[in-house]
């Protein structure tokens, strides 16, 4: 399992870091078997596995439930679990209680929290021993305000993102996710931080990349963002399901190959 120190060492050696989301035991098991460096249990599970329209409906209980399953599936991978909307920003005491509950009950290596406004939370969480990954740029929990669009696209916005990135690092963040920002801006931020910067829709100048499992494998998704490359096609599973339906209806399944050979009814009838 990678440690924070090893991830920083990868950055220093310019070894790219791979990160993929996982939301359950089998997907986590696959991601670990593939040798991916980090797993993100993202609140995107709201759309990908729970069928919500956004991350807004995702609860702390949801994140704990799925985080536990992922840890069981990937016991030897660095796992980061999202703080869902409402888990940060109520009061510092409640925020830290939520963070501690999520961190302890999922056995994660770190938690992730969105936005530039959470630097005081990062400081406090770090002080009590909870590693925090920050998330800037497009933050899905705020799409109701900012929308799904490129962030940092003006001079002022870019300068603010650079400042925000420095602030979350100074607050103690162990890594930073940058989403949907210009490539050159992401590269500039990555160069000026000592912590690993993981990009999603931020070009190749970051220290690593993260993609959503269901997006990159075309597994039950209707829309994919511009920055998503499809690496496999899990949608072919529908063809298998259709064939199963046909074979059940025709009586072709189960054939002898898939049937136990033991005969018991002669013995039952002989006892009558």
Curated annotation (Swiss-Prot):
GO biological process, one term: pantothenate biosynthetic process
Record-listed 3-methyl-2-oxobutanoate binding positions: 43-44, 82, 112
Pfam families given in the database record: Pantoate_transf
Active-site residues (renumbered): 179 (proton acceptor)
Gene Ontology MF, one: 3-methyl-2-oxobutanoate hydroxymethyltransferase activity
Keyword Transferase among UniProt keywords: yes
Reported cofactor(s): Mg(2+)
Keywords: Cytoplasm, Magnesium, Metal-binding, Pantothenate biosynthesis, Transferase
GO cellular component annotations of the record: cytoplasm
Catalytic activity: 3-methyl-2-oxobutanoate + (6R)-5,10-methylene-5,6,7,8-tetrahydrofolate + H2O = 2-dehydropantoate + (6S)-5,6,7,8-tetrahydrofolate
InterPro entries: Pantoate_hydroxy_MeTrfase, Pyrv/PenolPyrv_kinase-like_dom, Pyrv_kinase-like_dom_sf
Co-factor binding comment: Binds 1 Mg(2+) ion per subunit.
Class of this enzyme: transferase
SUPFAM superfamilies: Phosphoenolpyruvate/pyruvate domain
Residues that coordinate or bind Mg(2+): 43, 82, 114
Pathway listed: Cofactor biosynthesis; (R)-pantothenate biosynthesis; (R)-pantoate from 3-methyl-2-oxobutanoate: step 1/2
PANTHER family per the UniProt record, alphabetical: 3-METHYL-2-OXOBUTANOATE HYDROXYMETHYLTRANSFERASE (PTHR20881:SF0)
Subunit structure: Homodecamer; pentamer of dimers.
Role according to the record: Catalyzes the reversible reaction in which hydroxymethyl group from 5,10-methylenetetrahydrofolate is transferred onto alpha-ketoisovalerate to form ketopantoate.
Record-stated family: Belongs to the PanB family.
HAMAP family: PanB
Protein's name in the database: 3-methyl-2-oxobutanoate hydroxymethyltransferase
Species of the source: Staphylococcus aureus (strain NCTC 8325 / PS 47)
Gene of this entry: panB
